[in-house]
């Protein structure tokens, strides 16, 4: 199925909100999105200021639990910023823009994109904003203020800028297909599940359109990527196997298709013996931390977690001073995630989960080795027509 609308008109960049404050330490941020013409995407820039000494415990991604785009009461986009940014990572092939610094008083920020088309200038897939009475952006947040491990004065320092790319048509508006992304799973796998196969239900039935692709994510700190889930299947109606693969083979396919890789820059404030969970899987090389002044510095790696080792030069005596260290972390693929793709190259290959013959659609992972518990998330991308 292809929409074939090819809407004619002019694309324009729209500033919806500039440096709006969240206003509270926690709650739900609501903001109306213009409901006229067509929208190609909405772009969010969110920032907050670190505590006076440092911020070793919180990031923009960690303190926002959910983002939603609600259209006339229906949620068409939803997810944690970490997961929505992982989808961005696949689309652009690199770690999305962010400043994840732990330095005291510094500004952390990250970008989250909500695209409705296959690219920024897609004239076939657009959100027909003109069709709706109300479009609301909702963000659930709980900023943690702390002088050493959190943010500072978040009620005034936490800010958001909202922009969009809009198509102003030169002909009468018509309904169009658009892409929607929904986080359908946000749970944990316990170690008691090791060696078992789990059934994760994907959406089926009226209102769910076509499933173009979905992304699965599983993470446990200090574990290498591809350990918590070893292999998986995608099954239609409990009998038709659409995909059978291993986690690592699937990630290799992702690299070939999306050219996805990681080069993550981060400034951490750590002392001798302290750790940092980088959330970057299968690091390409050991971390090398340069010497500073009269100190020799280094770090060892276990899975995604770095343990820092500082010593006074020529003495071997541990140096407990916590200084900022600027790190480049590199790996292939999108960390701890894989994309199961049906319709990126041809929308017609997407799975029509509204068909009366479709009664179940499942992601079936085999759990490998989990030490304690691993977070598991799943985001589904659908082709919609409201």
Regions inferred by a protein language model and the residue ranges of each:
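Beta-strand-centric surfaces of beta-sandwich/beta-rich domains
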Residues: 1-386
């Amino acid at each position: 199925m292809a929409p074939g609308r090819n809407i004619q008109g002019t694309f324009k960049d729209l500033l919806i909100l500039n440096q709006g404050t969240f206003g509270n330490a926690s709650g739900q941020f609501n903001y109306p999105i213009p409901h006229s013409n067509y929208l190609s995407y909405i772009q969010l820039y969110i920032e907050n200021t670190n505590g006076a000494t440092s911020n070793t415990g919180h990031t923009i991604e960690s303190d926002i639990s959910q983002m939603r785009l609600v259209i006339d009461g229906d949620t068409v986009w939803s997810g944690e910023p970490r997961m929505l940014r992982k989808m961005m990572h696949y689309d652009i092939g690199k770690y999305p823009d962010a400043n994840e610094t732990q330095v005291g008083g510094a500004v952390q920020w990250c970008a989250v994109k909500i695209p409705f088309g296959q690219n920024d200038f897609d004239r076939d897939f657009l959100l027909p904003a003109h069709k709706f009475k109300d479009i609301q952006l909702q963000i659930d947040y709980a900023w943690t203020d702390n002088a050493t491990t959190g943010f500072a004065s978040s009620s005034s320092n936490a800010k958001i800028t909202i922009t969009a790319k809009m198509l102003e048509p030169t002909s009468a508006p018509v309904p169009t297909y658009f892409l929607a992304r929904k986080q359908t799973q946000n749970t944990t796998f316990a170690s008691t599940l090791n060696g078992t196969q789990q059934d994760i239900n994907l959406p089926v039935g009226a209102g769910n359109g076509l499933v173009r692709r979905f992304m699965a994510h599983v993470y446990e700190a200090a574990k290498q990527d591809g350990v918590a889930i070893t292999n998986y299947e995608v099954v239609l109606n409990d009998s038709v196997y659409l995909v059978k693969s291993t986690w690592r083979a699937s990630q290799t396919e992702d690299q070939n298709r999306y050219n996805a890789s990681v080069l993550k820059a981060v400034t951490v404030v750590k002392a001798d013996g302290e750790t940092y969970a980088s959330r970057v899987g299968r690091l390409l090389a050991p971390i090398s931390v340069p010497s500073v002044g009269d100190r020799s510095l280094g770090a060892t790696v276990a899975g995604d977690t770095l343990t820092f080792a500082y010593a006074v030069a020529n003495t071997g005596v541990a140096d407990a001073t916590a200084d900022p260290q600027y790190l480049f972390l590199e790996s292939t693929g999108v960390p701890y995630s894989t994309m199961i793709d049906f319709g990126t190259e041809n929308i017609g290959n997407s799975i029509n989960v509204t068909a009366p013959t479709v009664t179940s659609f499942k992601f079936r992972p085999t759990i490998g080795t989990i030490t304690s518990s691993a977070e598991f998330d799943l985001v589904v991308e659908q082709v919609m027509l409201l």
